[in-house]
Amino acid sequence: MTESKNDTKSWAPKQIWIKDVLKKSGTELLDISKSPAKAVAVKKSPAKDSATTKMVYYSANQLLIKTEQSSQAQFCLQVPPPLTATTTSVGLGVPPSGGQQEHFELLQTPQQRQMQLQLQDQHQQEQQQFVSYQLAIQQHQKQQQQQQHESITNAAPTAAPSAQRIKTEPVGGFPASAAVVSQVRKPSASKPQFKCDQCGMTFGSKSAHTSHTKSHSKNQDLSLNGASGAGVAAPVSTAAIELNDAGLPVGIPKSPTIKPLANVAAGADPYQCNVCQKTFAVPARLIRHYRTHTGERPFECEFCHKLFSVKENLQVHRRIHTKERPYKCDVCGRAFEHSGKLHRHMRIHTGERPHKCSVCEKTFIQSGQLVIHMRTHTGEKPYKCPEPGCGKGFTCSKQLKVHSRTHTGEKPYHCDICFRDFGYNHVLKLHRVQHYGSKCYKCTICDETFKNKKEMEAHIKGHANEVPDDEAEAAAASAAASTSAGSSAGSPSLQGVSSNSESSNHSPPSSPPATKKPRQARQPRVSKTVAATLSIPTSSPLSPSSLSSTYSPSASSMASPPPTSAHYLPVQMEADALSRDSGVSSAQPAHSTYADEEPTDLSMQQVQGQLPESTVDYYQAPPSLLELQPQPAGLTINPALLEAASIARRHDDNDDQVQDEDVHAAAWQMMQLCRGHGSLPPTEQPAPSHQPQVPTLHVSDLAANYDDTHEATVLIEHFKRGDLARHGLHKGYAPVPKYESALPNPDVVRRVEAAIGLRSSTESPERSSSPESDSLMMADRNVMTLPLRKRKHYMNKGDDGQVDSEKASGDGTSAAGGAASVGAGDGPGSKVMRMSSVIQFAKAS
């Protein structure tokens, strides 16, 4: 460099001496520190001074001497700034060639010149080493392509969708840029390959390549340590690594030497790998490790035929196909195939991002994400499309897989609404918006929609928490229904006015269950009465099973003082049309009927013919049903008296009184209801009692069993106490109250109802095959009133088939009084009728 600036005294004479020397040679010396800044570029010299040359001088810097020819018109300093403006930089100045050109010379000390020459020599040596190394890699790569194992090159590209990449570790003296350039990718192949740069082996997946390269770390460390200890750079072998027929490096056997070491220290592993000298405790681990050197993969997936070197890896991989995910996140509930995925997933909740990009400082959760991200900086695209003529590259295998669908036409995503197929998931999501709107996830339970899948899954879990509560409520409701059904016979006045067939609650269900509404909790009498009054007009017409086919309702309704438009339907008769299998009749005429209906009881046709101006018509069932079922017989008991007797027995004398005219009107209706059967000659019939009846009962027997005076007296005495008003009878309505037995045994209840009920229904298509219904007996009837085609449905088994009245009524006479036994009694020699259907009027409500 230059002399010291502090020695100004010694430097001043030198400046004078230099000026004198330069003046003699026609050169002028300028001090830039004392001259203006713009004096760096010297103005054009006059023609007369063109022979003189000016020199630019920087104080405390190197001196640059510039000479010009006399023919040049302008002086221009073209030296690079590091050579003239800085004091520490050392450049590689090369004087330009040419006689007429400018000549630059850098004034340097001998030490600086020697240092510069050493750096140049070192740089040239490094370049030569790098070039030789690159030539060795390329030569070995060509040989490897020719001798590659057939099982690796012919494998399907989908078996291991990973990139082919040859990684080379830079030698100690190489610059960092050399390591980047040395990553030579193998030319296009059907399957990406990863090649070990030390032994020349190729692998179809990145994980196998990484595992294999680790096996060389021990030998590599030893060689590097030996080379550094000797002080000599490790020589780079230019010879290619030889491979055998199996594609393995020459010198590596197919199987390891499984023999414990002779001199092993206590606690050390006795089994050593003969390739990398790594030791293991058991031979199985040595065999598994040795596959990283040989590349053997004996375990194959039966689903996708992917090969694995470790059996445990195959077991974990198989869970992808079997959808088994035993490792579950405690935070969000997501499950994974193996513990490693769960461990990486937990970083999402903890916020840990341990992998950081050295270029842009971006962080990642997984190391694979960082590797893919680094390719955006390096521009590497190792995943090439194998389709001829395409040649597109991608940074990750997933992008290549999606791109390949453009060539194969695969559309793996399906719309569950219109069944259209799509090749991309994001296109399917956009399509589903057309069906669902922006909220394209729909709950399968309540049809609520959500914007994303997580919200829908959380919502469905809420439904799962509600299931036990619903089951508890259903159990409580069923218990309440059974309790109310069991206690309904004890207090029939609390149930409102309904059909007497309601008592058969436990009969086998042959009618549709939807026709019977579940019973609600008990309400006060006033509210139940109002509900009964409001529900009457909405009742459906009676089916042919009702008593309207046996009674003569037109005569009774026209002769009665109340209006003929009175509703005779019970409260719960909505399902009457669906209960034609019942053996118990409602004994009520229909309010709204049809003009083409005819009575099913042929004995009543004469009475119908005498009243051509009747206001009540009847509905005729389909002929197919009439031909298959027997016709009804005569009435056996008056349900009104049964209800009157039960009410009189259960209620005390403190009830409210009702007006006498309403009581008389209701009693008169019931008496006229019975008088309609007086057209046929009556026979001698004993009074209602527990004694057996006469063997043959006719339809007209009912008229002789009732005394008008006694009947009216009984009704007036008991209905005066408010019972009639509570049953809706004080305003002209005369429905027959419901009769329910107090017996807890449903079998006894069915037998009593079969004995006292009317057999007037046609067979329903929903005929039950219950053995209990077939074993029920019913009272004798006048079979001669049926058509000839109907009689074949009845089997006469003689006079020995008597049904005991005590067994038929049982304890049920406590609720029905003596009238129950009247309808149930069968004298000796009565005909035994086997019922072919189930009592269903209990389910009609």
From Swiss-Prot:
* Zinc finger (C2H2-type) stretch: 194-216, 271-293, 299-321, 327-349, 355-377, 383-407, 413-435, 441-463
> What highest taxon heads this organism's lineage?
Eukaryota
What Gene Ontology terms describe where this protein resides (cellular component)?
A: cytosol; nucleus
User: Listed disulfide bonds for this chain?
Assistant: none
Q: Where is the composition biased (Polar residues)?
A: 582-591
Q: Name one GO molecular function term.
A: DNA-binding transcription factor activity
Composition bias of kind Basic and acidic residues appears in 796-809
Region Disordered, as annotated, extends over 141-164, 469-610, 757-845
A Gene Ontology annotation in the biological process aspect, one of them, is: metamorphosis
Composition skew (Low complexity), residue ranges = 474-491, 498-508, 532-559, 759-775, 810-823
Give the UniProt keywords, A-Z.
Answer: Developmental protein, DNA-binding, Metal-binding, Repeat, Zinc, Zinc-finger
Please state which protein family the record places this protein in: Belongs to the krueppel C2H2-type zinc-finger protein family.
Q: What does this protein do?
A: Plays a general role in the hierarchies of gene expression leading to metamorphosis.
Q: What is this protein called?
A: Krueppel homolog 1
Taxonomic lineage of this organism? Answer: Eukaryota, Metazoa, Ecdysozoa, Arthropoda, Hexapoda
